[in-house]
Amino acid sequence: MKVTLSVLKADIGSVGGHTLPSRKVLAKVEEVVREEVGRLLLDAYVFHIGDDIVLLLSHTRGVRNQEVHALAWKAFREGTEVARAEGLYGAGQDLLKDAFTGNLHGLGPQVAEMEFTERPAEPFMVLAADKTEPGAFNLPLYLAFADPMYSSGLLLSPELRPGFRFRIMDLAQTERDSYIELDAPERLYDIATLLRDSHRFAIESIWSRKHGEQAAVVSTTRLRNIAGRYVGKDDPVAIVRTQKIFPATEEFGPVFALAPYVAGDTRGSHHMPLMPVRANTPASTFFCVPMVCGLAFSLREGRLSEPVDLFADPVWEAVRAKVVEKAQEMRRQGFYGPAMLPMEELEYTGIAERLKALEREFS
């Protein structure tokens, strides 16, 4: 059976600042989506990460389907109206256009979609991040799909040994989407050359070279390229298929336990570690530490199993404690050096404007 998974995410308002959506907003979004299960949709699941609401939709309409995207737009718009009625902060923040134009690409919400023929057992993960950048998944996915130090299946499984093809997007290209495809392990150094710069380059998708099957897809939208100004971080979502011809689910744990430094945090202008958290966790009041959650599902004839929260077991409490130490050390450095993003990546323009004013005082 050919199935499409669509993951769509947006910040449409939150309680007391950038924390979490209200119960009423979540309920309205889920109500709109649930009305279409059994009609337009095969199944659906709604959750949040920080103040971002995430929709997981299963259907047979293919990627970029107008009806599916219109449903997500309707859910986010109606949720926004509830947020406005409640006086929530940033109501409708990620909805950058007034009207739906056929699909959600370019309208603000993050979108990751994948169409594939369902295997007899089809395990997959949904990853969702908040308070960070599109390239935040670069290192974890690189290590899981290309580094046998972290993904032992690359050595142990004949299905994985031929490696994976990485499709990488140049986020600096604003006129059109610009991609390059590189094969691991042969082009490993070239892949690393690009992915090290998570501000400019981001993984868009990953493919099995032996089977030609898509393994992963990641959203790559930059909100400021749409709005022309800072309107929030470009936190990614991803769909990752696991097991058999792909890395095992548990091989994705150690790569996220690294908690790499990424762009984001308060005002989207700092480097901080990416903390693995449970789904439905509010954004941290400790400078909005960048966060990622992961839910694993099994899929059968387009129907979703109940999810398992990948970052909820006791091991992750120890990981989070170390992430907090990394975050505290970086924040102790305040505005100085690598603690704050370079000028071209700062989401707020205050420093650039101040520098222009100061230029007149130089002699």
From Swiss-Prot:
InterPro entries: FBPase_V (IPR002803), FBPase_V_sf (IPR036076). GO terms for molecular function: fructose 1,6-bisphosphate 1-phosphatase activity; fructose-bisphosphate aldolase activity; magnesium ion binding; oxidoreductase activity. Pathway: Carbohydrate biosynthesis; gluconeogenesis. The keyword Transcription does not apply. Mg(2+) 3 binds at residues 233-235. Its cofactor is Mg(2+). Dihydroxyacetone phosphate binds at residues 18, 131, 267. It holds the Pfam family FBPase_3. Mg(2+) 4 binds at residue 234. Keywords: Carbohydrate metabolism, Gluconeogenesis, Hydrolase, Lyase, Magnesium, Metal-binding, Oxidoreductase, Schiff base. Its EC number is 3.1.3.11, 4.1.2.13. GO terms for biological process: gluconeogenesis. The active site is at 11 (proton acceptor), 230 (proton donor/acceptor), 233 (schiff-base intermediate with dhap). It catalyses: beta-D-fructose 1,6-bisphosphate + H2O = beta-D-fructose 6-phosphate + phosphate; beta-D-fructose 1,6-bisphosphate = D-glyceraldehyde 3-phosphate + dihydroxyacetone phosphate. Mg(2+) 2 binds at residues 51-52, 130, 235. Mg(2+) 1 binds at residues 11, 18, 51, 93. Homooctamer; dimer of tetramers. Consists of a single catalytic domain, but remodels its active-site architecture via a large structural change to exhibit dual activities. PANTHER family: FRUCTOSE-1,6-BISPHOSPHATE ALDOLASE/PHOSPHATASE, FRUCTOSE-1,6-BISPHOSPHATE ALDOLASE_PHOSPHATASE. Catalyzes two subsequent steps in gluconeogenesis: the aldol condensation of dihydroxyacetone phosphate (DHAP) and glyceraldehyde-3-phosphate (GA3P) to fructose-1,6-bisphosphate (FBP), and the dephosphorylation of FBP to fructose-6-phosphate (F6P). Belongs to the FBP aldolase/phosphatase family. This is Fructose-1,6-bisphosphate aldolase/phosphatase. It comes from Thermus thermophilus (strain ATCC BAA-163 / DSM 7039 / HB27). The lineage of its organism: Bacteria, Thermotogati, Deinococcota, Deinococci, Thermales.
